[in-house]
Amino acid sequence: MESHNTLNLDMEKDQEKAFDYSKRAQWLRAAVLGANDGLVSTASLMMGVGAVKQNVKIMILTGFAGLVAGACSMAIGEFVSVYSQYDIEVAQMKRETGGEIEKEKLPSPTQAAAASALAFSLGAMVPLLAAAFVKEYKVRIGAIVAAVTLALVMFGWLGAVLGKAPVVKSSLRVLVGGWLAMAITYGFTKLIGSHSHMYV
């Protein structure tokens, strides 16, 4: 009987550990995705502006505005999303336990919002830092592409490890997606910019 109880306790501990690891992996994966979003959107924005305005200050200010706007948007979106999940879980706990709520098991909307904004900001800092200290336009564009490429590969690898997906395929998918976003933004802005000069 005693050995049976010990076995049950060990199984419960293993389940708790697996649950904790799963929650941690979800948070880390969300952080990687947020950072990747900040990286690609800010770099694409800077590349787009750089297609028509070669001034370093304009590129940096545009990137910084993208960082602030994106971080705020991510934080608000995550807060609303997690708060909805929080309300659902509270209602479910009340039904199951007759009114008792275990707050430590509930998601924190504030923490989720802060983590999302921070992850986005960290990703967005990569192209900003790459461009900040380069005055020559072509070298600056090259520095942004190189820095973003390295970061995309790293984020792709991290996402694959956390999601237990094939590393090479995942990294290539993230890399190609980032390159496409930058190339499309640059190309369209360049096209519109060149046509707008004809009517000025």
UniProtKB/Swiss-Prot annotation:
UniProt keyword annotations, A-Z: Ion transport, Iron, Iron transport, Membrane, Transmembrane, Transmembrane helix, Transport, Vacuole
- The highest taxon in the source lineage is Eukaryota
**Looking at the UniProt record for this protein, which Gene Ontology cellular component terms does it annotate, in alphabetical order?**
vacuolar membrane
Species whose genome carries this gene: Arabidopsis thaliana
Q: Topology: which residues are Vacuolar? A: 53-59, 135-140, 195-200
Q: Fetch the InterPro entries from UniProt.
A: Ccc1_fam
The annotated topology with respect to the bilayer is: Multi-pass membrane protein
Q: What is this protein called?
A: Vacuolar iron transporter homolog 3
Q: Which GO terms describe its molecular function?
A: manganese ion transmembrane transporter activity
Q: Could you tell me what this protein does? A: Probable vacuolar iron transporter that may be involved in the regulation of iron distribution throughout the plant.
- Stimuli inducing this protein: Induced by iron supply.
Read off the Pfam families from this record.
Answer: VIT1 (PF01988)
| Parts of the chain that traverse the membrane | 32-52, 60-80, 114-134, 141-161, 174-194
Reaction(s) catalyzed by this protein? Answer: Fe(2+)(in) = Fe(2+)(out)
Per the record's keyword annotation, is Transmembrane helix included, yes or no?
A: yes
One GO BP annotation of this record: iron ion transport
Q: Transmembrane helix: is it a keyword of this entry?
A: yes
Where is this protein localized, as stated in its record?
Vacuole membrane
Outline which residue ranges sit on the Cytoplasmic face. 1-31, 81-113, 162-173
Q: What is its main location?
A: membrane
Q: Which family does it belong to?
A: Belongs to the CCC1 family.
**How does a null allele present?**
No visible phenotype under normal growth condition, but decreased accumulation of iron in the root and increased accumulation in the shoot when grown under high iron concentration.
